[in-house]
């Protein structure tokens, strides 16, 4: 079987993890205590969920996952929450002191004490897999544990599991909404540390999710639970073809092959449709054409940037539910005919399609309406460079005054690492600029040299 291990790091990783496992359990008919719901057992006989769950001798299903945080509060809520019986106690790992929003604490001092225990637990889960496919790491760029410990853990995974896929789901600092002052430092440092280690990084920013909740779901003041349930639907769509039967299934390695033209350019933009409230759902047809068009609208994106200003290099459309390939082909042809959607000239086909037969699952009490079909689009576009330049600008403003740097140096980090990380991100911005140029332009520039 092609198993996948999910690793949830820090507060953001843990809370997104809670929403994801709640949804996976619903989709596979597994109760919060880990046992199969007898009413839905017959529907889930295909066994595809063994990619994400392992089965014990007593017929209990245990997630192939690890939760880790340097302070206990958030994971304690999992230990006492409705899904406390789902997880093995050894899968929930906590330290005693916080990373205090400091990358250096998560990466060098506090994180170092915990990393051996975590890699040991991961090894134990990996040994229980017959054909491990890879890892999904959930964390935030801005927090101390998410950025510092997340990077440290990826370094270990890269050493021990060189050939396995390593995909990240990262909460990226939003343009306006900020949860900490030093977010730009942590984000630049962790991106630099993991740039060569992760195979593919799906970014979400809270501001985009807030806007989607406000505009599409009519929630005046969205909570983190609303955001995480929205993100969980996206994660579920990306992993659905690994867990269910479908007419066009997409493997983990296929994502990379189709979405990553160069190793460093591995930050696809995530878009999901339809996101509608129950009140609006009755008035919308949600045809394949309609939901495909919605994916190219900026207001359904998970990161704030303008795709109309950039060019698409590769696009992966993952459909779920009542979808037939012919409709998809028609929708894609219409999209290609639109002049507003620009592709780079060196990638003529540009579309990878996945179709999973199982429609998205509705969570009781969730604002997202039940729909027959949905699509998640992963697109590698040059416009995401906008997000990097925004982040770099914030970094520069603080670093020009060396503000807050002493907190990092005090934890054993060298100041040179800041400028090294910043240079690496400047190079990343240039990489995006170059791949967006037409091949004719590039040839012309080379001749001039």
From Swiss-Prot:
Class in the EC hierarchy, top level: hydrolase
One Gene Ontology MF term: hydrolase activity
Cofactors (names): Mg(2+)
Gene3D superfamilies the UniProt entry points to: Helix hairpin bin (1.10.287.600), Tubulin/FtsZ, C-terminal domain (3.30.1330.20), Tubulin/FtsZ, GTPase domain (3.40.50.1440)
Catalytic function, reaction form: GTP + H2O = GDP + phosphate + H(+)
Site (Involved in polymerization): 449
Chief place of localization: cytoplasm
Function, as annotated: Tubulin is the major constituent of microtubules, a cylinder consisting of laterally associated linear protofilaments composed of alpha- and beta-tubulin heterodimers. Microtubules grow by the addition of GTP-tubulin dimers to the microtubule end, where a stabilizing cap forms. Below the cap, tubulin dimers are in GDP-bound state, owing to GTPase activity of alpha-tubulin.
Record note on quaternary structure: Dimer of alpha and beta chains. A typical microtubule is a hollow water-filled tube with an outer diameter of 25 nm and an inner diameter of 15 nM. Alpha-beta heterodimers associate head-to-tail to form protofilaments running lengthwise along the microtubule wall with the beta-tubulin subunit facing the microtubule plus end conferring a structural polarity. Microtubules usually have 13 protofilaments but different protofilament numbers can be found in some organisms and specialized cells.
Family: Belongs to the tubulin family.
UniProt protein name: Tubulin alpha-2 chain
Organism listed in the record: Schizosaccharomyces pombe (strain 972 / ATCC 24843) (Fission yeast)
Gene: tub1
